[in-house]
């Protein structure tokens, strides 16, 4: 029974739309800014780096907390612990409160990586920063850093590989429009 409670809690925790809440407090309707997405990247487009940093922190924190809670109930490397990691990302991407229209899961994935393996965090963050500063596309940085985390897991924590591969497929699915825009040269750069 407790595994189901942890699974539901992971999804619910992931579905808390922190970015939407904190921008609404500032009088901004995030759904009407930039891409309309509720992730930290779109919060950055509101012009407030502090609010964007807070959104990134909170979205990452929910991924970390979900895995931390799962670790209290399940063995490291267990199916149930990894299922909780996937469910928190699914909650962020498809929150029931927002008609299943949420963020893209990158910050939440960072949080689960922090809870699971610091080596993967280093690969993820290094690649994200390198690609972002080289090309100024947040979406490209997110996609390549996700691939880097999956590939790194194969070498540093193989039991995590299929979990991260699943999360990567979800992230690529949520970035579909960004991928099309990148291929067509229409993706918005950060200046």
From Swiss-Prot:
GO terms for biological process: phospholipid biosynthetic process. Keywords: Cell membrane, Lipid biosynthesis, Lipid metabolism, Membrane, Phospholipid biosynthesis, Phospholipid metabolism, Transferase, Transmembrane, Transmembrane helix. Pathway: Lipid metabolism; phospholipid metabolism. It is found in: Cell membrane. It is a multi-pass membrane protein. It holds the Pfam family G3P_acyltransf. The keyword ATP-binding does not apply. One of its GO terms (cellular component) is plasma membrane. InterPro entries: G3P_acylTferase_PlsY. The chain crosses the membrane at residues 5-25, 50-70, 78-98, 112-132, 153-173. It comes from the Bacteria. It catalyses: an acyl phosphate + sn-glycerol 3-phosphate = a 1-acyl-sn-glycero-3-phosphate + phosphate. Its EC number is 2.3.1.275. GO terms for molecular function: acyl-phosphate glycerol-3-phosphate acyltransferase activity. Catalyzes the transfer of an acyl group from acyl-phosphate (acyl-PO(4)) to glycerol-3-phosphate (G3P) to form lysophosphatidic acid (LPA). This enzyme utilizes acyl-phosphate as fatty acyl donor, but not acyl-CoA or acyl-ACP. Probably interacts with PlsX. Belongs to the PlsY family. This is Glycerol-3-phosphate acyltransferase. It comes from Wolbachia sp. subsp. Brugia malayi (strain TRS).
């Amino acid at each position: 029974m407790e595994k189901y409670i942890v699974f539901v809690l992971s999804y619910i925790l992931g579905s808390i739309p922190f970015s939407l809440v904190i921008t609404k407090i500032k009088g901004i309707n995030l759904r009407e800014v930039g891409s309309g997405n509720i992730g930290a990247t779109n919060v950055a487009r509101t012009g407030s780096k502090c609010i964007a940093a807070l959104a990134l922190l909170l979205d990452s924190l929910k991924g970390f907390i979900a895995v931390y809670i799962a670790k209290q109930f399940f063995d490291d490397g267990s199916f149930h612990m990894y299922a909780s990691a996937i469910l928190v990302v699914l909650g962020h991407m498809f929150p029931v409160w927002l008609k299943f229209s949420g963020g893209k899961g990158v910050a939440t994935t960072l949080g689960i990586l922090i809870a699971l393996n610091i080596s993967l965090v280093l690969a993820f963050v290094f690649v994200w920063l390198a690609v972002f500063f080289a090309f100024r596309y947040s979406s490209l940085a997110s996609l390549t850093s996700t691939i880097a985390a999956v590939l790194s897991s194969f070498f540093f924590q193989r039991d995590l590989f299929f979990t991260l591969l699943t999360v990567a497929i979800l992230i690529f699915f949520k970035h579909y429009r960004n991928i099309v825009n990148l291929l067509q040269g229409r993706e918005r750069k950060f200046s």
